[in-house]
C-alpha cells in the first residue's frame, strides 16, 4: 500500500568506499535535509555542506535536491553524498530518522517511481536486472528494457490488439453492418500480424530470461568420472579437488561462469554412490534436490567407448537415484577421457565426447549447451525478461491461437473474448492491471535504497 510518508536508505553497496550516498524521498525530504545540513537547498544544485545530528557535525559532502516531479521517484528527493564509511552513513540515517523519516523497504524507491508513473512495471524490474546483471550482454539488454524498448514493443502490440477488438465488438453490437468474419480481410490480416508479433516477442523473451537469470547446469555421474575436472575446464580455473580417489568432491561446488555472455550456474554434486560417510550421504541428498531444479543435466561418464549409453543406463549405475530424475529434463551424456583413444567418435544427438583434463571438445560442449536452451545470440533484438513475462507472453500466445480458431469458425463473440484475454495478459507485463500481491513480490526482491 503506497503511503506518502518520507523514506530514507543507503543507496550505495555495503562496505567501505570513497563515497556513500543516502537517499531521502517523500513530502518532508527537503525539510529533513535542510535540518540535517542547516542550509537552504536549491533544486538541482550540488551544495557542499556539513551534515549534522542536532549541533554535532557527522560529516561533510555534496547534497542535491530534486524537486517533484522531476526526480527518480516522482516525489521530492534529496541525495546526500558523504564519505563511504558505514558508521558515518548509519549516523546520517539515524539523524534522518530522528527528523521524521522512516527506513525504506526493499525496492520502495523504485516502487514509488512505478506508482507515480515514472516507470512502468517492466522498466522497474529492469532496474533490478541492470544492478544484478552478471555479464556485459545481460547489462546491455537490461539497459534496453530500462529505456523502455520492451515496454514499447508491448504497448505497440496492445494498440493493434485493442483496435482489432474494438472493430470486432462493434461488428457484433451493430449487426446491420453485416460483417462476415470469415471473409473480412481486415480482421484476418490484423489478427495474423498480431500473431506474428506475439510469436517474435515470445522468442525474444526466452532469450531475455536466459540472459537475466542464466542457465543452471548440474554435473552428475559416477565417482571419479571426471565431473570436477569438467567443472574446472568449463570455468577455466580450479574450483574442486581433483584426485584419483572416488568420492573426493564431498559437497556441492558452485561455479558462475559465462559462455558467449550467457551466465552459467554450474553445480558439481557429490559423487553418487552408496556411502556410510555422513557428509558424503548429505551431499547425495543435495545432489538430488539440485537436479530437480536444474535446466540441464550433464551426465559425465568415463565409458568413452560406448556411444550407445542412454538415459535408462543411469538406473544400472545408480538405481536409487534414477527415480529422482525428472523424465522430461534435458540430459547430455558427456563421454570424458577420450584422450585415451586413438580414434575419437563423432558427437551425435545428446552425446558429446571430451577430455576435460586436456581441454578437448570443451568448446563444442559449450556450443551444445547453448543450443539446447535455444539461445541464438541475437543481441540487437534481446531485452531482459523474467519468468513472469514469459508466462504472460506464452499465455497470450495460446489465446491468440484460440482467437484464430474462433475466427475460422466465424464466432465473433468468442473471438472478442479471446482478444480480451490476450490484452489482459499483455497488460500484466507493463503493470496496467497488477495486483498488490504481485507488486509486493516484485519490489521485495530489490536491494534497500533502490
UniProtKB/Swiss-Prot annotation:
Residues 214-374 form the TrmE-type G domain. One of its GO terms (molecular function) is GTPase activity. It holds the Pfam family TrmE_N. (6S)-5-formyl-5,6,7,8-tetrahydrofolate binds at residues 23, 79, 118, 450. Mg(2+) binds at residues 228, 249. Keywords: Cytoplasm, GTP-binding, Hydrolase, Magnesium, Metal-binding, Nucleotide-binding, Potassium, tRNA processing. It is an enzyme of class 3 (hydrolase). One of its GO terms (biological process) is tRNA methylation. Its cofactor is K(+). GTP binds at residues 224-229, 243-249, 268-271. It is found in: Cytoplasm. K(+) binds at residues 224, 243, 245, 248. Exhibits a very high intrinsic GTPase hydrolysis rate. Involved in the addition of a carboxymethylaminomethyl (cmnm) group at the wobble position (U34) of certain tRNAs, forming tRNA-cmnm(5)s(2)U34. PANTHER family: TRNA MODIFICATION GTPASE GTPBP3, TRNA MODIFICATION GTPASE GTPBP3, MITOCHONDRIAL. Homodimer. Heterotetramer of two MnmE and two MnmG subunits. Belongs to the TRAFAC class TrmE-Era-EngA-EngB-Septin-like GTPase superfamily. TrmE GTPase family. This is tRNA modification GTPase MnmE. It comes from Francisella tularensis subsp. tularensis (strain WY96-3418). The lineage of its organism: Bacteria, Pseudomonadati, Pseudomonadota, Gammaproteobacteria, Thiotrichales.
